[in-house]
Amino acid sequence: MIVTETIIRFENVTKQFDNDPPVLDNVSFEIEKGKFYTLLGPSGCGKTTILRLIAGFLEASKGQIYLGDKVINQIPANKRPVNTVFQDYALFPHLNVYENVAFGLRIKKLKKEAIDEKVKEALRFVNLKGYEKREISEMSGGQRQRVAIARAIVNEPEVILLDEPLSALDLKLRTEMQYELRDLQKRLGITFIFVTHDQEEALAMSDEIFVLNKGEIQQSGTPIDIYDEPINKFVADFIGESNIVNGKMIQDFEVEFVERRFECVDQGFRPNEVVEVVIRPEDLEITSAEKGQLQVTVDWMLFRGVHYEVGCIDIDGNEWLVHTTRKVRVGDKIGLAFEPEAIHVMRLGETEEEFDKRLDSYDEVQ
């Protein structure tokens, strides 16, 4: 049996500025020790506000924030065992690499020998051994990122907060840093809480993801759970690309959409309940028109390197997006085939608690 330890807990936390609508609205969640978490959502969803509340840069309007079993609402930022890596890294340009990393230790008045040992160990962890005397202005974006992380881990915090730290990097370097951050977190065993609006980053790096929108957590879970079983239209559309159509759940394992009935793997709905149906683009296979479960016309096509992105329209005007390695032409009449497992049925207005309970019932039946 795996024993987990909760390191951070939000209980009914609200954050409101003046008389504006709440930036966070009655949010509750738990963060387990030693995992990589991502707060994912569009601009203004509240993800950075959560980070600042944990760091102590903001104070909650309502609710309690716990570190372990201790309420930390009134504890100042410099007294919390938390370090933040900012989007712009916030390095001191007049200090070299060594002094940037040593800065927090000097504030704590550690002995010179202890500082030297800790700084060199932190730089070794981020693969910057030998860069101690390098000026910040001489460092690349990726190297500055590593310096900022070394400065965070040198204080041996219980939690490291990362506020969109990869957003300023080019695509290749950003991908490399994703692997490095994930590897570093595993080696350190420290809880990482990472903020991003980039879905691919979240899916690639996280043990768990919190998807936020308009100050509320829409869904939390592993990357696979959230991608394969989105709770609502927002999550389905925000995490990856989706085909979403209105439908009706006829009975367990049978759903109707585009005026046809299909076998599915979903259950626990009321007979003839109005639902939304999701099929991912990579789960649609292009066939001849007569063999397809859906008959569509190719409207446009883009080459994306590893696959073609094909936009199609069915006879009712519904748009379908397909990811395929098969080349087609605009105007072609084709069929789209898919397995029952490719169909995901979403209940309108379902809460995360209700959603989890319904998924658990699937396991009980199996």
Swiss-Prot record:
Membrane topology listed for this record: Peripheral membrane protein
InterPro entries, from UniProt? AAA+_ATPase, ABC_SmlMolc_Importer, ABC_transporter-like_ATP-bd, ABC_transporter-like_CS, Mo/tungstate-bd_C_term_dom, NA-bd_OB-fold, P-loop_NTPase, PotA_ATP-bd
At which positions is ATP bound? G41, P42, S43, G44, C45, G46, K47, T48
Instruction: Give the GO cellular component terms, alphabetically.
Output: ATP-binding cassette (ABC) transporter complex
Principal subcellular localisation of the protein: membrane
Q: In this record, what's one Pfam family?
A: ABC_tran
Molecular function (Gene Ontology), one example: ATP hydrolysis activity
Key words, A-Z: ATP-binding, Cell membrane, Membrane, Nucleotide-binding, Translocase, Transport
Provide the catalytic activity annotation.
ATP + H2O + polyamine-[polyamine-binding protein]Side 1 = ADP + phosphate + polyamineSide 2 + [polyamine-binding protein]Side 1
Domain ABC transporter, residue spans:
8-239
What EC number(s) has UniProt assigned to this enzyme?
7.6.2.11
The similarity annotation says: Belongs to the ABC transporter superfamily. Spermidine/putrescine importer (TC 3.A.1.11.1) family.
Biological role stated in the UniProt entry: Part of the ABC transporter complex PotABCD involved in spermidine/putrescine import. Responsible for energy coupling to the transport system.
Q: How does it assemble?
A: The complex is composed of two ATP-binding proteins (PotA), two transmembrane proteins (PotB and PotC) and a solute-binding protein (PotD).
The name of this protein is Spermidine/putrescine import ATP-binding protein PotA
